[in-house]
Amino acid sequence: VYILECSDEKSRARNYAIVKAVAILGTLLVPLLRATLMQNVSERWHVVYLVPAIIGFVMALFALLFAKETNVFLTKRIEYLKTPIEEREQRSKEEREQNAQGGILTAVNFAFKHRQLRFLIIACCCFYLASLGTATYSTVMAKSALMTEEEITLALFLYPVGNALFTLISGFVSDKFGRKITIIAMSCSALACYLLFILSGMFKWTPYLTGFAIGGFMGSYWGAGDTIGGIMFSESSPTNLRSSVTVINTLLNGVMGGLATVITMILLPIIPEKMFGYMYLGLTVPGLVGAIVIMWLFVGETRGLDLKTVTGTEWDKPKKN
């Protein structure tokens, strides 16, 4: 939300993608620490993640102390403070009646009453069913592809590169061609990259290609995911509900990811470890296809909208008299 509100309409997705891509390159620390502190001994994995955790905490504290409030929020706040008290009370009463005062329950209620956010939620439900591939690539490399710890470390050196590259691509495509085209293109890219990851690992191609492919999948998948659940949710919500509405996306990710995990728990005992990768590939297809269809048919384009004036009702069909 902060990045989006600090950007103009024409460069919103691009700026979001640039910041995220730079952050992703920071995960090069993981293979570097695997090769140095962990020394490719799997029992020492906790040492690898301790250093990035400390760095992340320090940077979050730095942002908390020194980041300024966004102009979008300040404009709304100043406008409110300049309003006479009587008018504020009347406006507050009207906003309460319209469920527009913030909070997760209010945001959910508001979202299901309005066409755009309602179908974005449905699209996200489909999309996050395919999220298993983002959390299981280490298992696929170790159990299905039978890669050694050294090979996995080499693959992880190219993972952030592929991830950052496809993240950048999604941002530039989104601002140039629109949100819908981005979701379709990056979803197709995610399927292609995951297939390449499986083939490269299973047929013992170079681990660098394996790492780049899974990085490309992650960048493509979350490039589409950020566009659906991050950018489009924000661009389809009024300012006073924007943060709460984006929390819905996070909750959907957890709920649908949990459902996908339950499905795999049922399948894993009856599927050989060698086939895990193919199983995860098969589970990504229905969710991504469903999200593409819903986005294309039922969700309106949001590129170029002014976040200061969005009400969330722009896509509602006129009520019949």
Regions found by a protein language model. Give the residues of each.
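Extracytoplasmic gate region of multi-pass secondary transporters
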Residues: H114-A164, G257-T261
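Juxtamembrane intracellular "pre-TM" segments in multi-pass secondary transporters
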Residues: R77-R118, K317-P318
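Glycine-rich segments within core transmembrane alpha-helices of 12-TM secondary carriers
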Residues: S11-Q39, I55-G56, N249-T261
